[in-house]
């Protein structure tokens, strides 16, 4: 690396995905306040991530179904039986 072009706090940081329970060692300037012991026995500053390539559906191939149906079908499911006529 060329000297003098990187910030002073450019160091190895552990980016830890809390959903996948997996970490990545990356050189970064991210500000951190906590440290974590890594698999190699060294202690690194840790940056907690909610999503990374280990847990994102695009990279894992797993799909999440948030809403299968629209608002109209929710209405029909809730109130559809009130419009039917009952025979005596």
Curated annotation (Swiss-Prot):
Q: Which GO terms describe its cellular component?
A: ribonucleoprotein complex; ribosome
Keyword DNA-binding listed? The answer is no
Which UniProt keywords are present, listed alphabetically? Answer: Ribonucleoprotein, Ribosomal protein
Answer whether the UniProt record assigns the keyword Ribonucleoprotein to this protein.
Answer: yes
What the entry lists under InterPro entries is as follows: Ribosomal_bL28/bL31-like_sf, Ribosomal_bL31, Ribosomal_bL31_B, Ribosomal_bL31_sf
- Pfam families in alphabetical order: Ribosomal_L31
Do you know which PROSITE patterns this protein is assigned to?
RIBOSOMAL_L31
GO BP terms: namely:
translation
GO: which molecular function terms? structural constituent of ribosome
Hey, which family's this protein in?
Answer: Belongs to the bacterial ribosomal protein bL31 family. Type B subfamily.
Alphabetical list of NCBIfam families matching this protein: L31, PRK01678.1
**Summary of subunit composition and partner proteins:** Part of the 50S ribosomal subunit.
> Which protein, by its recorded name, is this?
Large ribosomal subunit protein bL31B
Per the UniProt record, the source organism is: Pasteurella multocida (strain Pm70)
């Amino acid at each position: 690396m060329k000297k003098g072009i990187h910030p002073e706090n450019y160091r190895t940081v552990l980016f830890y995905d809390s959903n996948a329970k997996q970490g990545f060692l990356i050189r970064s300037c991210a500000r951190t306040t906590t440290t974590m012991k890594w698999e190699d026995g060294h202690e690194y500053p840790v940056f907690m991530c909610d999503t990374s390539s280990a847990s994102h559906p695009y990279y894992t191939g797993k799909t999440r179904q948030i809403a299968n149906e629209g608002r109209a079908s929710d209405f029909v499911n809730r109130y559809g039986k009130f419009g039917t006529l009952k025979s005596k």
